[in-house]
Amino acid sequence: MRSFQRGALDLRPVVLTPGVSRYAEGSVQVEFGHTKVLVTCSTEERVPPHLMGKGSGWVTAEYGMLPRATHSRNQRESAKGKQTGRTMEIQRLIGRSLRAAVDLSTLGPRTLTLDCDVLQADGGTRTASITGAYVALVLALRSLQKAGTISKLPKLTPLAAVSVGIVKGEVRVDLDYDEDSTADVDLNLVATADGRMVELQGTAEHQLFDRKALDAMVDGGLAAIQKLTAAQAQVLG
């Protein structure tokens, strides 16, 4: 039996709690079962050097885990003096995904930074981060509009992310830690509400997989993402 007595293609209970930060322009706490991530969106009136003078904006992300987000304490990466390759990979994925959600040319010369801090990890921290980051991004843009910084909201493309895998020969959606650590195939899918894929990362961990298995995983993931984007829409109103 899977956690939360769910079926193979069912998500864990998903909770999106907006406005959890007093100071950030946009914020949300996202929960995928026992995985909990705090996402804030901050705006700065500057852009990276490659965009200076072009009138375009930028969206980027940072990702990190609290020391006791896992079963045993991990030293803060800031104390180690450098980020791990995993951290850099995940925050780049989050940034790429959120740039696909907004028309950067309509942002003006400003940067929106999504900070994703894992409070508790039980698998799917990167997919939960992306799903929550979209909500935080929209809330931040609404704050900018309310303040008169931007005249209207940029064109937005709702998107979310979910993990999919093959565990014990079965395609499963939204893997928890125990499933993820034993999965034969592990896949992360980022896609829009209307089923267009932003990013697809799949790895044969313990066994090879064919096109039929890939299609089954993608189908299950896209169906789950429709549920996630519906949850986002409900929170955003």
UniProtKB/Swiss-Prot annotation:
Main enzyme class: transferase
Record-linked PROSITE patterns: RIBONUCLEASE_PH
Protein name, as recorded: Ribonuclease PH
Organism encoding this protein: Myxococcus xanthus (strain DK1622)
BP GO terms, sorted: rRNA catabolic process; rRNA processing; tRNA processing
Subunit comment: Homohexameric ring arranged as a trimer of dimers.
Assigned EC number: 2.7.7.56
Record: residues binding phosphate: R86, G124, T125, R126
This protein's encoding gene: rph
One Pfam family, short name: RNase_PH_C
Reaction catalysed by this enzyme: tRNA(n+1) + phosphate = tRNA(n) + a ribonucleoside 5'-diphosphate
Annotated family: Belongs to the RNase PH family.
Biological role: Phosphorolytic 3'-5' exoribonuclease that plays an important role in tRNA 3'-end maturation. Removes nucleotide residues following the 3'-CCA terminus of tRNAs; can also add nucleotides to the ends of RNA molecules by using nucleoside diphosphates as substrates, but this may not be physiologically important. Probably plays a role in initiation of 16S rRNA degradation (leading to ribosome degradation) during starvation.
Keyword Electron transport in annotation: no
MF (Gene Ontology): 3'-5'-RNA exonuclease activity; tRNA binding; tRNA nucleotidyltransferase activity
InterPro entries named among the record's database cross-references: ExoRNase_PH_dom1, ExoRNase_PH_dom2, ExoRNase_PH_dom2_sf, PNPase/RNase_PH_dom_sf, Ribosomal_Su5_D2-typ_SF, RNase_PH, RNase_PH_bac-type, RNase_PH_CS
RNA-binding listed as a keyword: yes
